A protein has these predicted regions:
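Intrinsic structural disorder
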Residues: 1, 50, 130, 232-233
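Rossmann-like NAD(P) dinucleotide-binding subdomain of oxidoreductase/dehydrogenase enzymes
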Residues: 1-109
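ALDH superfamily catalytic-core signature
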Residues: 65, 71-231
């Protein structure tokens, strides 16, 4: 949705294809644009699954450019479709972005930024810092600080102003996260904290905000894994 602003500023019309699991926020954005006086037909919204909605858009000859943020598999399909009509593309695809920490870094700032980079929006950001590479002389101290602070991250719903991290987008997403953690453990990495679904017991304890009610949300504890190598899945 953030790409709407640059598209309009450059004088373009647009078709916004929102993720199928989060259509309502895009609907609210479109309503706000209409209220601000955006002419009919300049901004357009389509909702639904990528195969049914996004795929035809990337193939349509009247679409001049496709900007996509998401997974590598989908990105390859879009690039292939776009090539048929020589569309321009801007593809921000999935990756494991590293934060590199040197021994002369401002320690507290580095810890805070590493945690924010990893757990902002519960890690559901294409630029999330899901890997941390630490200079060996600083490793133990840095990891200990990460674990200590991760254990204090407040978990809560989207309307809880004290919450520092929120729910995952779906139960399937949580199952995928849990499977990755299990695989890391099986392949020799160490799960230093987290590594399971969050419960009301957690939010009534050190992860609580005092007002946390998980309700029907899908949550996973902030998790720190140590000892991962390039050879691991």
């Amino acid at each position: 949705s953030w790409k709407v602003g640059p598209a309009l500023a450059a004088g373009n019309t647009f078709v916004l294809k929102q993720a199928e699991l989060t259509p309502h926020t895009a609907m609210l954005l479109m309503a706000a644009l209409k209220e601000c006086g955006l002419p009919d037909g300049v901004g357009n919204l389509i909702t639904g699954a990528g195969a049914n909605c996004g795929n035809p858009l990337s193939q349509h000859p009247d679409v001049d450019m496709v900007s996509f943020t998401g997974g590598l598999v989908t990105g390859k399909i879009i690039a292939k479709n776009a090539a048929e009509t020589v569309k321009r593309t801007a593809l921000e695809l999935g990756g494991k972005n590293p934060n590199v920490i040197f021994a002369d870094a401002d320690f507290d700032v580095a810890v805070d930024n590493a945690l924010n980079g990893a757990f902002f929006h519960s890690g559901q950001v294409c630029s999330a810092g899901s890997r941390i590479i630490v200079e060996e002389s600083l490793h133990d101290k840095f990891v200990d600080a990460l674990v200590e602070r991760a254990n204090k991250i407040k978990i809560g719903g989207p309307t809880d102003e004290k919450a520092e991290t929120g729910p995952l987008i779906s139960a399937e997403h949580r199952e995928k996260d849990a499977a990755y953690v299990d695989k890391a453990r099986e392949q020799g990495a160490k799960i230093l904290t987290g590594g399971r679904a969050a419960t009301s017991e957690d939010t009534n304890g050190q992860h609580g905000t005092g007002t946390s009610d998980l309700g029907a949300g899908v949550y996973y504890l902030p998790t720190i894994i140590d000892g991962a190598t390039r050879e691991m899945d």
